[in-house]
Amino acid sequence: MSLLLQGKTVIVSGVGAGLGHQVAATVVRDGGNAVLGARTEANLAKSAAEIDPDGTHTAYLPTDISDERQCEALAALAQERFGGVDAVVHVAAWDSYFGGLEDADFGTWQQILDVNLLGTLRMTRAALPALKRSGGSVVIIGTQSAIASPNEVQQAAYAASKGALTSAMYSMARELGPHRIRVNTVLPGWMWGPPVQAFVTFTAHTEGVPEAEVHARLTDRMALPDLATDGDVADAAAFLASDRARAITGQSLLVNAGELMR
């Protein structure tokens, strides 16, 4: 049996220490070539070296997805190095701004929308010529909070930007379907990886309670006893990027240990 992404070339945006790194590692593990993009070259080099020490199945380029020319350059690198693009997985996002409407800095909101919404669309459009030649897949990493009220952390701007992407997914799926390009979204809930680990540690320190207590607040809401991990979300993205999802488009897949079901 062939590997899930055997011979496929996948652009992964937002490759840092967390989910982006895990997605790129999963692509290579499953037989594909990963083309890594992120703003910081040192992070890209570190990820590529860990994932693919001999450099056979990875390439990378510093990329700010708010810059259309940089998106085009990353797509061109995939074409030059591996001969095409079979999928794009959008992990890059601005997710470090907290708060709701009443205290909103709309200038920051505009920047978040420019990265999370328009940046994803820029990167998708940059890859379209290659995707049209191959047929293929666009996988957006969204968030459960785009479709349901969050319980612990208020990130209204982030949720709004990802909710807009979920709506854009439907239009793109319809527009690009005739070219055999599928567009889907993975919606993680609480995901055990560096950001959530930091949240648990910070909250425990702030409240003066054990980390296990904070962790239990999260898992108590799940149908399954363990939080999803970065690896679980990466596996879902790899499936949607693969030919085994050839008849799936315009869909949102929750990866959340059953916290929200729909």
Label each region the model flagged.
Residues 99-101, 105-113, 218-219:
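Substrate-binding pocket helix/loop in short-chain dehydrogenase/reductase
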Residues 177, 182, 248-250:
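Short, small/polar-rich loop/turn modules that mediate ligand/substrate recognition or access, typified
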Residues 9, 16-17:
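Conserved glycine-rich cofactor-binding loop
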Residues 2, 95-98, 238, 243, ...:
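Short C-terminal tail/terminal secondary-structure segment
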Residues 30-46:
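Conserved glycine-rich Rossmann-like NAD(P)H-binding loop of the short-chain dehydrogenase/reductase
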Residues 139-164, 169-178, 191:
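Catalytic loop of short-chain dehydrogenase/reductase
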Residues 62-73, 106, 232:
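The beta1-alpha1 cofactor-binding region of Rossmann-like NAD(H)/NADP(H)-dependent oxidoreductases
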